[in-house]
Amino acid sequence: MREAIHLGCEKCTRRNYHTTKNKKTHTEKFSVKKYCKFCREHTLHKEMKL
């Protein structure tokens, strides 16, 4: 079953994006470089709980 997750900026800790992930097949935490409009740059965004 897919579960909703938030992606939070590692620099300012704001939750800018949300997505879903299958926890059975992807057990590790999700992280991706995305644009943070508060920092005004591309930063690493990591999975956070809702």
UniProtKB/Swiss-Prot annotation:
Molecular function GO labels: structural constituent of ribosome
Keyword Ribosomal protein annotated: yes
Superkingdom of origin: Bacteria
Gene3D superfamilies recorded: Ribosomal protein L33
GO cellular component assignments: cytoplasm; ribonucleoprotein complex; ribosome
InterPro entries with a match to the protein in the record: Ribosomal_bL33, Ribosomal_bL33_CS, Ribosomal_bL33_sf, Ribosomal_zn-bd
Gene Ontology terms describing biological process: translation
Pfam families linked: Ribosomal_L33 (PF00471)
This protein's UniProt keywords: Ribonucleoprotein, Ribosomal protein
Family of the protein in this entry: Belongs to the bacterial ribosomal protein bL33 family.
NCBIfam families: PRK00504.1, PRK00595.1, rpmG_bact
Name under which the protein is recorded: Large ribosomal subunit protein bL33
Taxonomic source organism: Sulfurimonas denitrificans (strain ATCC 33889 / DSM 1251) (Thiomicrospira denitrificans (strain ATCC 33889 / DSM 1251))
Gene designation per UniProt: rpmG
